[in-house]
Amino acid sequence: MNKLISACAGAGKTPRIVSEAIQAIDKGERILIITYTINNQKEIYEKYKSLGGNDYKNFKVKGLFTFLLEDIIRPYQNVIFKERIESLIFNERDPHKIGNRTIFGRKEILDNGETNPLHFLTQNGNKAHSTYLSKLAKRIITKTKNAPIKRLEYIYNKLYFDEVQDLVGWDYEIIDAISKSKKISLTCVGDFRQTIYQTAITTKKPLSTIEKKQFYIDKNFEMEDISLCRRSILEICELSDTVHSNMGFSPTTSNVKVNDPNIMNHIGAFAVKDSDVNNYITRFNPVLLRSKVTSGKKYAIESLQKFTYGKAKGLGFDRVLILPTKEYISFLCGERDVFNDQKTESSKNKLYVALTRARYSVAIIYPDVIPKNCPLKIWTPE
């Protein structure tokens, strides 16, 4: 049975899947965990070691692009391209476009019916475009009648796709192909509220959270929700839940208890007036989260740890101070439709990520005249 584990922020999904992997290895099984970011790969290996894992022959972790190249494309690429694809080039934009103009000669199929190398590869032919890597992998799976999937069946018993919220479009064709295997147990893990990055520039669905969740329903994946947070106190969980309150996620609960008097004197979610920010920083020494690395320089932030919203993903801190965008202020003051006209869910998801980094207190900087409908406690210097 294939499974989707949808885990809230701070749920401990990495310990969960690594513990499962160790148990499976003890039974003689071979495990591959696939994830998107390098930081996540390191975190998984570190957790494996800390939990007592030591069988690195049967426990493997790969980045998504490495997996696609090594396990699907290269072993069978000669059905489409004869020259070895050495590596990939990471695309921050569509490699077939300059601005809104499509570059001539990049269509997938040439007039003679053959595959156009320039659709998938750089001009020298030895590097693949990252944004079309899953599409190329799917073409090879189809052309070889599932040969890469059969090869995977000989190598691994269990596959985990971690951070599946970052996958889009053609990536889901790969998941679909693997899910049809009768010999591989496939588990996908993620939190769709934390979709900040995505693996490709594409218009191919699924793209949105709703579309991605529907994919797993349509493919008959077993669904498991983990809504118990092991990082943040309940008040912070409840505030972060409001960001996606209309999207069908289970309410987040918390098992975090606070007994330290030095922590208990300031817990929860707070609004801090602009003119009080430096006093707040001096008192609590929070970690600053902001939209850009250049933001917030008018405050006394030199000694603080500082992260952009995206770079803070996966991290946790005792106390967090958020320098919000105007949209975040509006949302937190009750304008729940402020994100509706945006093309992607990235901005909304970054707010969720920022709020859920905090263990005990999260403070948001407001103008000195705080709107009357602000639901947060207002912090004032003693």
Residues covered by each model-derived region:
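The feature marks helicase ATPase cores and/or their adjacent C-terminal helical subdomains
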Residues: 1-382
